[in-house]
């Protein structure tokens, strides 16, 4: 068994909260494999390429990946080439603002925001 029924249900719940973002992102694809479960595939559309695939181990793992992607969007938007834990106060405020709708629906995963900002995981 790839995931317990409870684990798969929780992954599906996180997937649903981030559904629009998952559909629209040009940077990754979330795929299902009968052999390994959910796979986070790093891709590019311009130029077209497929990079690395990482198995999603848990709902927290998927939520972390999605929240990290939201934060990276802000850093790309500002044109600053630095790590998330080095974000300036304006970037941090925008990242937290963009995280809020997701964390409001997934409050059990709010701790991941702190982990991301502290460079953990």
Say what each PLM segment does:
Residues 1-32:
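Negatively charged, low-complexity tracts enriched in Asp/Glu with abundant Ser/Thr
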């Amino acid at each position: 068994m790839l995931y317990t029924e409870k684990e798969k249900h929780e992954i599906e719940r996180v997937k649903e909260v981030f559904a629009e973002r998952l559909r629209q992102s040009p940077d990754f694809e979330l795929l299902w494999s009968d052999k390994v479960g959910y796979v986070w595939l790093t891709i590019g559309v311009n130029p077209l390429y497929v990079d690395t695939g990482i198995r999603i181990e848990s709902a927290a793992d998927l939520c972390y990946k999605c929240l990290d992607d939201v934060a990276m969007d802000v850093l790309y938007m500002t044109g600053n080439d630095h790590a998330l834990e080095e974000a300036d106060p304006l970037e941090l405020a925008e990242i937290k603002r963009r995280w809020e709708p997701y964390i409001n629906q997934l409050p059990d995963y709010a701790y991941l925001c702190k982990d991301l900002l502290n460079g953990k995981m």
